[in-house]
Amino acid sequence: MPAFLKRLIFQVGDQASERTYTYTSVSNDGHYISLRPLIRPKDDKEREFPVEWAFAGLNTDIRVTKIDEYTVTQDFNFWIDINRYLKVPNIHQGEVHTTWKRWESECLEETGTVYPFGPDKEGVNFMELWQPLDSNRVEDVVAPIGMDNSKDRSVVLKIDDSKYEGLMIVVGKWAQGLMTKKGESSTDGINMIRSVETSTNSYKTLFSQGSNVDKFPSAFENLSKGTKVDVNGFEWEVIESTY
């Protein structure tokens, strides 16, 4: 079922902090996107590109295994990963193996190990704590315990042509998109957007990055799976549509 999660804590080793407004959207079919803009960029480099990380993937790019009633493993092989796109040195390569435990509060504890210096080198452990939000609210509202969101709106659009690849996921009132230009490896080729539906049924942009943010879809009503949507010359395909 769809999910809209806010990260509360990011911990590497003994150091826990949170410098971002990180939201992760998961569609009803299991497609996913995570945008992690910085709250207070601390230097010129961060001010120029105020993003910790962003990635997106299809349901074919993740493997989920149930361990028990409260625990699953999720193995990610991201379709779009801006660290990989930017060729950032010393980053994990390949599948990322994670374990997710649901607490009594319904917060989700994600743990895992990455190997930025190579699979034969010492790994780096991490933990992220996630709070499920009510995606039908425009504010950060904690999802009530036991909330059934199986019928929430879940719409996914994809672009993958000769020049661009990207994913746009709408869960409830919240839309997030990530798109990269093929053949490049600089921040100039990265575009991302986060927006929320207002009382007038339009979408208010809360965060955006890139010169082609006007090429993201901005209307999500009455879309049928398999149809094409033209946005200022960019053709997006609806790959999921649940209302």
UniProtKB/Swiss-Prot annotation:
CDD domains: HRI1_C_like, HRI1_N_like. The keyword Transmembrane does not apply. GO terms for biological process: protein targeting to membrane. The keyword Lipoprotein does not apply. One of its GO terms (cellular component) is nucleus. Keywords: Cytoplasm, Nucleus. It is found in: Cytoplasm; Nucleus. InterPro entries: Hri1 (IPR031818), Hri1_N (IPR038744), Hri1_N_sf (IPR043047). Belongs to the HRI1 family. This is Protein HRI1. It comes from Vanderwaltozyma polyspora (strain ATCC 22028 / DSM 70294 / BCRC 21397 / CBS 2163 / NBRC 10782 / NRRL Y-8283 / UCD 57-17). The gene is HRI1.
